Amino acid sequence: MSIRTERVAELIQRELSGIFEKELPRSGVLTTIVGVKITPDLSIARVYVSILGSKEMGASVMAHIQKENKHFRKLLSSKIRHQFKRMPSLEFYQDDLFDQAAHINELIRKANEASSPTPKPDDEA
């Protein structure tokens, strides 16, 4: 990734985070933009969103984000319009890395419990 694309990705991430904080409904889930990857020609910004909360609420928030894609792009464009000739189109993806890490930790914990011998009680007479 070139320095220009990294700077653009950081700018989009920072500004979209502020937009999400103001625009997304407060529904008991924590929504965070964990990363933005932008194509070399700056035409597409892939935005990775982490949603902490129940699966149902996460799906609902992600559906809302997808539905309001054009609205978020318009708000973002109004904030950073002087820095681009053409605003990149936004693609939102749910980042489930936190869930995957929790699942792997659970598997490791179960494997450790299964492999460790259970202590036998001492017979005291």
Curated annotation (Swiss-Prot):
Keywords: Cytoplasm, Ribosome biogenesis. One of its GO terms (cellular component) is cytosol. The keyword Methyltransferase does not apply. The keyword Lipid metabolism does not apply. NCBIfam families: rbfA. Belongs to the RbfA family. This is Ribosome-binding factor A. The gene is rbfA.
